[in-house]
Amino acid sequence: MEKQSYISTIKDKVGVNVNRCYQCGKCSAGCAVAEDMDYPPSMVMRMLQTNDNMNYTALLKSESIWLCISCQNCLTRCPMQIDIPALMDYMREKALEEKTINKKSNNILSFHRAFLDSVKFTGRLYEIGLVAGYKARTMNLTQDLDVAPSMFMKGKLPIIPERVKNKKQISAIFSKTKE
């Protein structure tokens, strides 16, 4: 992305003006996953404020954008009401578009895709479909296998997915997102 363009593009596409952030740090203090991120939310904001292409590229390659769980704690705590979860969504889209995904984040992306495929196929989350899709994508078939029997016995892994009403509406949502 050309210098001087990504800050205005973010503002236009996401409605987030990164320059409004005055680095109070409340977003990072309230973030449930900040300690696992390579760049906590306040640092993401600062890196974008520098308008440096190296920082922008580093963010696209970072785990931070994939670890964000969009809980909106940062938005709730931000005195400037900066929508960091929307910004993180945008950064994930750009990372996918520019094929700059961090290899460590591939499992997170695989989980996202397995989750969406499960909802798309059944109209709601089907746990066994989610696990099967995730394990097939990551080729990590045996990890966590030991917890499956107890989850099954507690009714947490139904063999047949529940039917949902108005599955056509859910299909329509997925169709619209492809447009």
Model-derived features: positions:
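Juxtamembrane/interfacial segments around transmembrane helices
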Residues: I69-R77, L116-Y126, P158-A172
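C-terminal, charged low-complexity interaction regions
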Residues: Q143-E179
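Ferredoxin-type iron-sulfur electron-transfer modules in oxidoreductases and energy-metabolism complexes
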Residues: M1-K13, D36-W66, Q81-T142, A148
